Amino acid sequence: MYPGSSQSRPYQVPPPPPMSPPLSQMHQQMSFVPPPPPPLNRYQTTPNLGASAPPPPPPGPPPASALNPQAPWNGAWGGVPAPRQAYDNRSGMYAQAPIQQYNPQAHAATAPGLNIPPPPLQTDAPMSDTYNPGQDPMFDGFMPDLSFDLEQETMGSSQTWQTTSSSSTNTASVNDNVQSNAPTEERTRRNNSASITGTQSSSNVPGIPSDITASWSLDKVIAWLQMNSFSRDWQETFKSLNIHGAQFLELGSGHFGRGNFGMMHQQVYPKLAKVCTASGTGWDQPREREEGKRMRRLIRGLVHARAVPDSARVPSSHGRQGSINSRGNDKGTHDGSDSPNTPSSQSRSTTIPTFPDGSSFSNHRGVLKNIDIDRHSSPKLNGDSPAASPNPVMASSTPKSSTLSVSPHSSRFGNNVRNSTDSVKAIYGSGIPADAQKMMSNSNLDELINGRGARQSPSDLGDNSAGTDSPVSARDTKLPFRQRMQAKDIDGNLSSPNGEGSLSPQMYRNGLGLDDYLRFKKPGGSIYLMATADGWNYRVVDVTDVETVLDLRSEISRGLGIPDEDGVEFYLTELGKSDHSQPLDDNQLMNHNKSRADAEGTLKLFVKPPPMSQQSTWSAGDTGQRHRFGTSSSMSRQQNTLKDDQSEEARLRAQREYKAEIDRKGREYLAIRKAKLESNNNGLSSSTEGIGIVGKPVDFDTPRHSPYEDKNTDRMFPTRNAPAPPVAPSATLNRVNSLMTGQRRVQGSMDGYPSQRVPPGVGTTTSPKEMSEDRRRQPMSGSQPMGGITSALVDMGRNLGGVALPNRGVSANNVPSKPSPPYRVATAPVSGRDFVSPDNRAAFPRSQTAGDLSPISQMPANFAAYQEPNPSPRGFGAAPVSSAAHKRAPSGPDIDFTEPEVSFDRPAPSTAQNEAQSDDDSGDDSDDGLFVIPIAARKASMKKAKSRASVTFDASDSGDGKRPALTVNTARDRKSVSFNSPQSARTGDDDDDSGRQRRTPKSDMWDSEDGKLGRRKSFKMDVWANRPPAEALINNLEDFFPGMDVDQPVLEEGDQEQNIDGSPVAPSPIAEVDETQSPGHLQINATPLNSLPPSRVQSMYNESDTLGSDESTLKALERPPSFQSLAQRSVRRSGGLGRMKSIREKARGAHEAHKRYTQTSMAAPQGLSRSGGTPATETQPTQNNSSALLRRKSTKMFNANIVQIRPNRDSMLVPDIPQDSISSSSRGAPKHPTTFRWFKGQLIGKGTYGRVYLGMNATTGEFLAVKEVEVNPRAAAGDKKRMKELVAALDQEIETMQHLDHVNIVQYLGCERKETSISIFLEYISGGSIGSCLRKNGKFEESVVQSLTRQTLSGLAYLHREGILHRDLKADNILLDVDGTAKISDFGISKKTDNIYGNDKSNSMQGSVFWMAPEVIRSQGEGYSAKVDIWSLGCVVLEMFAGRRPWAKEEAVGAIYKIANGEIPPIPEDVQDTISPIAVAFMMDCFTVDSHDRPTANKLLSQHPFCELDPNYNFLDSELYAKIRGTY
């Protein structure tokens, strides 16, 4: 209250003013006016002040200036009156010179001249966020407020009241290096007229040191933009706006650490839009917004990288004992800017003198303006001070006066009563960025929204509780009505929000109100969650920018003020929930954060600190009478009002009282909630019992009709009679039939696709499901009906007329399709090109399903050029006829044929039937019906076609109504059907065109529609067989090797596949059998070679051979003793006797050679002839097996020249690369070609470190699996060490595997090293892994498990004999071929050792957890041996029996714990009831916990009964083969 004024002066209290008067005016008046006497009966002067004490500050400005910045300030000193205002009824006030309009930007920096000594070093143990009175002798029975830290409140104790008052209401520019105790009018004018650019160009941007801002000139900013790839438009924008220095750095680090949004949106983006428009680039708002975000992130990184660490700051020398350190982890080197509770003010807090009569003096508002801002951190030197100088004049610091306030109705100095949510940190938690703590003290709403300079918020003057008699505050009008009533009930009247007992949630940081900040935040722009450590007090944590679980845990821990340790547990919770039993793991925590966290804080987490964590037992947000004191900056050190002689008992008593108060409040709260719940339940039950509506039972079978339903459904009856069925053909129909007879129209569908005819008594109807991809999965067996055209239009009738095409296949029920006219060509794109319709009619292309391998993707791109249009007009077919049309009179054209007799004959088989097939592939199209090929064929082609071992339809030239004659060749295992084009339909130009017509993917080796590979199905869907067999690869080379013309003759035929006399090559003279075979078997398998000429078998090898493999097929053909083959090859080439072969022919030749030399021989003891024995598919022969498979191995290419062939961009020709290098050895013998050419095809798999592609050795025609691993340092994010380790692991894998050769191990064929990748060539295995087969088809039968186990154990025994540990044996790493062969793969973590069954201490924990042996997990420095693979094999056997992995009910951690404790994987009960005891015994032997007692691979293979060969077993008869054979 002002002197001389009346206490009963009523007037309306306007909102709070924006800022206290300028510092210079305060100093000017304080220099000439003596201090006023204290008012009577209200305040009492502080004792011990002495005559030298500075005068107290004047009263703060009236609250009316909050919404009226023009209102002058009336505060004056002593008897100097202020000008009277409209609301001021005081009399006797002297006139005062008008004060210039206040410019907030001019006072955004710290006033110079305030020599504040640095704070003392914190030598004692730091406190946690929650204060415990028994830990610090300073606080005697008081609880400090925990909403804000006070680390950077740096005001010296030698500062006077005058300086404190002025610094709390005003700031001065850093550029004005003039002492603040001698201000002038010129300085005041310069401060008030400071512009935005000038202020920001100086170093007064909060959180940015001045040395950084001074170094960023405009040229440096432009160069920085150019270096970071910002466009010329951005550079021109910054030049035109002259953005540099602090203004530039503030774009990314100012304003709560998120950048100056106002400047970006009001200046930068509008100017950028103009520049982009003027330059012709065009304004793309989303793109430029993303660029803006990137720029702000880069700027923020610049500022943070230059932050001055606390370790570089000069410690303070003053020994005040009144400092507080409320951060449990705030040590000497901790940067307060990184803490979520970073203080918002940069000034030292003050310890306020205690007056005996509980009163103070009238000039208290400026000193105690910020008492309601929560602070609890120790005062120390500002971390942003340049060069860690103790001088507190810093760019980002604003000295404030005090941390205590008083109410006009109370004379006690203390903290306000607050709810747990009445602090900014309680609401924002750790969500406010690191710089926001410092920014909020110097920013206001206008600055945040408009991007202008720092001006204090109207809410910054929190001193509107004094100087008026009316208790109504303008800020209280913003509160909800309920909170205002609560505040009124507590205090007896509607108290000021800054007064004692206020419940107003006016949480702000040195002036920025919560409402202002929330208005600044974009709606929906941030994501919050609520966290609590005690179930009572919740902190709001901003998780908007959280991307990893580590960041999320750190943010929550920092928000709650607990250490970020590994033992912190998180639970889902709700309000009032007290039991938390199931903690969240990292994945669950991130999933809940992504799905439930929103702008309203729906996600609530209960955080349980680790048991040994130094956490206080009280929450940082507890309410109650919390009193906080700071260190005094307004009086000397001797005037500390805290009593140092307070006893330990008093502190303990205060602690006990505080705990009792918190417990009492908790019990009261729970009692109130319980009462409310009970009352709600009682009210609900009473209302239900008393006035509840009891409805009649609802009968859902007879629902009532809604009056809003449409009643038209009740009148669904025929509105007219059905038309009478036709009794006899009409005249028009007869005319159509007569015309159709002469033209020999064939039937088809309306859209140009062929539909099949079903003659009476032939086959059964085909369901429409054949249209889908499932028809590709029909069994591939010689006895099964061959696949044919799909019944896509079966619902429209099977007797549709239309356009069909010559086809060599039959339908699913062995019914041939009709040939089609040649005038339609489908218009579907092939490799970027389109097929055009010569008759310009609209085509009706069928949409291709995922499993439909239509020939439209297989035909050559220039296929349309070879189609000759037929000028003869043809119409579409007749109307659809139902399947039962033969029961009544026909309603459409009669296009039936008379059925001829079908004769079967058995022509002599021809070994060259593939080559004898005609080049006229007009009948080679598939049944999909997407192509219509001209009805053109030559007589020679007809004659050749008749000799094919296939079903052939011969169409006569007469054009009568009879079907072509049908002949079936039963000599082949798989019958195929083909249509030969009628000769009557061809034109004169057809001879040349048909001869030049390229082969379609459905070439002469295509036997069945069932065997056709649906590549889209196999590669893009979750099917087991992702590696097709060789037959499917050959027939679909276009799909697997895109961009290459596989039918163009580009490869010159050499003598690798054929000798001079044309006889096929011989297999390797070395018996390619495994070491487990007896000598008798070796002799039996080698007998087929005796019939070959000696010159063909004899071969000489040297150790220095570059091919590196004795089993190489190329070595088998090497004939050093004679130069005749080389000379004959040269003569043949020079004389034009050689021929070029296409890629398809090369692959087919290699495949045929492989099939020819895959011979089966019967065991001699059984006395069976080679023709009378049953071939066995068991590929691993043992001593008691009945047959052995002579395997033709792939060519190894180690140490050879490997060249990858890449087609040119505009040409599909293969580059000409010489493949022969003639050199002489010491004996003068010519060397064999050492150059291998290969093509890379489609991706067939990928893993952690690389990808697997399909490849083909163009030199030999063999298919390969190419494992390609990138070794580019950029692929490892610049981690060169990791890349070196990867390359070393690959080298070790190649070195280990290149010499291995076993039927049950995937062969390593070669290696090619490039600058950025390493390619490993592996043996191509068709099919998939056992693991994928289990997931697709379920568990295996015991006979299959026994066979696969024996094969896997055989390969494992071979590895152990070679000294190799696999260490990652599981079902996913065992490949299963379609013939039942198991092959061990994935040797990425295998290791070679000398003592295979001896424990190696260097063996680390490697492998998959659920397949690990106990000694791998609990090695304890002893290491382990190769017997870990035996344990893994037992897990694989259990996996095949159960259909799921071992330890299926356990997670990884639980499985590790149980394995380490010596437990074995449990065998499910359903498995134990179905398998034999021998199988259980085998698994128990593998699961021997003691590795010394665990059997070896050889022992199990040779002695265990489960590994005995079953002579009656055939994989082709198993249920598993029946499931997987239709996969292709």
Swiss-Prot record:
Organism superkingdom = Eukaryota
Which residues does the record give as ATP binding sites? 1244-1252, 1267
- Function description: Mitogen-activated protein kinase kinase kinase; part of the MCK1-MKK2-MPS1 MAP kinase (MAPK) signal transduction cascade that is essential for appressorium formation, penetration and invasive growth. Beside its role in pathogenesis, the MPS1 cascade is active in conidiation and cellular stress responses. Targets downstream of the the MPS1-MAPK pathway include transcription factors MIG1 and SWI6, as well as GSK1 and MPG1.
All copies of the Protein kinase domain together span 1238-1507
Q: Which reaction does it catalyse?
A: L-seryl-[protein] + ATP = O-phospho-L-seryl-[protein] + ADP + H(+); L-threonyl-[protein] + ATP = O-phospho-L-threonyl-[protein] + ADP + H(+)
Q: How is this protein organized at the quaternary level?
A: Interacts with the adapter protein MST50 and MIP11.
Reported consequences of knocking out the gene: Leads to hypersensitivity to cell-wall-degrading enzymes. Reduces significantly numbers of conidia and develops appressoria in a slightly retarded manner. Impairs the ability of appressoria to penetrate into plant tissues, thereby abolishing pathogenicity.
Which EC class does it fall in?
Answer: transferase
Show the segment(s) annotated as Disordered. Answer: 1-84, 109-208, 303-418, 449-481, 607-652, 695-731, 746-786, 811-929, 943-1012, 1086-1191
Q: Where is the composition biased (Basic and acidic residues)?
A: 328-337, 642-652, 698-714, 1001-1012, 1142-1152
Organism encoding this protein = Pyricularia oryzae (strain 70-15 / ATCC MYA-4617 / FGSC 8958)
Offer an example of a GO molecular function term for this protein. ATP binding
**What PANTHER family does this protein's entry cite?**
MAP KINASE KINASE KINASE SSK2-RELATED-RELATED, SERINE_THREONINE-PROTEIN KINASE BCK1_SLK1_SSP31
Any one biological process term the GO annotation gives: positive regulation of developmental process
The record's section on SMART domains has:
S_TKc (SM00220)
Q: Where is the composition biased (Pro residues)?
A: 12-21, 53-64
Entry EC number(s): 2.7.11.24
Task: Return the Polar residues bias intervals.
Answer: 174-183, 191-205, 318-327, 338-363, 409-418, 613-622, 630-641, 846-860, 977-986, 1086-1111, 1158-1188
Keyword line: ATP-binding, Kinase, Nucleotide-binding, Transferase, Virulence
What this protein is called in its record is: Mitogen-activated protein kinase kinae kinase MCK1
Q: Which family does it belong to?
A: Belongs to the protein kinase superfamily. STE Ser/Thr protein kinase family. MAP kinase kinase kinase subfamily.
Encoding gene (name): MCK1
Give me the stretches of Low complexity compositional bias.
1-11, 22-31, 157-173, 396-408
Q: Name one Pfam family in it.
A: Pkinase
